[in-house]
Amino acid sequence: MKQVQTKRDWKKLAYDVVEEKVITKEDAIAILEADDTEILEIMNAAYIIRHHHFGKKVKLNMIINTKSGLCPEDCGYCSQSIISEAPIDKYAWLTQEKIVEGAHEAIRRKAGTYCIVASGRRPTDKEVNHVIGAVKEIRETTDLKICCCLGFLNEDQAGRLAEAGVHRYNHNLNTHVNNYESICSTHTYDDRVDTVQKAKQAGISPCSGAIFGMGETIEERAEIAFELQRIDADSIPCNFLVAVKGTPLEGQKELTPVECLKVLAMMRFVNPTKEIRISGGREINLRSVQPIGLFAANSIFVGDYLTTAGQEPTADWGMIEDLGFEIEECAL
């Protein structure tokens, strides 16, 4: 006889979290394993937590890809890696003028945070100086919050970025430590954690998340959320694998929209006070249920990603308005 699974009281669990009770790994796994028919109850419960901490505000972020491709790392998901055969644009560093122009485009798109991203293992000191020059001009001419994602950092580089006015540094954990060697062999999971810690020690707000759908188990998916809690990431981008043709993971089965919603809800339960951002793969994986994701998440990227297209900013603005939510400048 098939065992009947006991239905959880998701709303009670949400109020427990609001009252600052820490949920267990078993609770997180239960969210991920719940029957699909419970998804609206789960998202409603996640919204209780989201609304308590963030109301109806949605933070918009914009990415600029300042250096594309030409990366010596072999990350299996990435179209910019040395082993990728994906047909992407490849170029060296954009000029400081172009980076500053991008900041003004971010403002036109109603973004409060501008994310300066560059491919590669780690920046040289000269490259850090190049970014710092642009950051200083952006800080002098706009009210944007600035996030950088430049690869591995040493302590001196992190300190200089902080001094220049970089508010946030993104360095994703990407996947579970047990799954890491199957995704990348040119650096380790611990290398990534180290850079997050260096940024935090320099006084920069840490941004770190994962790419879901790269072969991790349900249990590992939950443990990623608790690892992000442990390293105290202030902003958590939840990416969903886009199986790009020409990369080693091109044949990987992508998550269903409901699986993505469960990830977002679980992440909100485990990290209730943190910025949860629906990131890469939003349009492709969530598809028509994108708006429901914002009942757990409180942040999205507006416009294109690094090498994949996003939807038009007007579509995102309309989605937010239709939900009765409102755009917030990303105060840290």
From Swiss-Prot:
It comes from Bacillus cereus (strain ATCC 10987 / NRS 248). [4Fe-4S] cluster binds at C71, C75, C78. Residues 53-282 form the Radical SAM core domain. This is Biotin synthase. The keyword Metal-binding applies. Keywords: 2Fe-2S, 4Fe-4S, Biotin biosynthesis, Iron, Iron-sulfur, Metal-binding, S-adenosyl-L-methionine, Transferase. PROSITE patterns: RADICAL_SAM (PS51918). Its EC number is 2.8.1.6. Belongs to the radical SAM superfamily. Biotin synthase family.
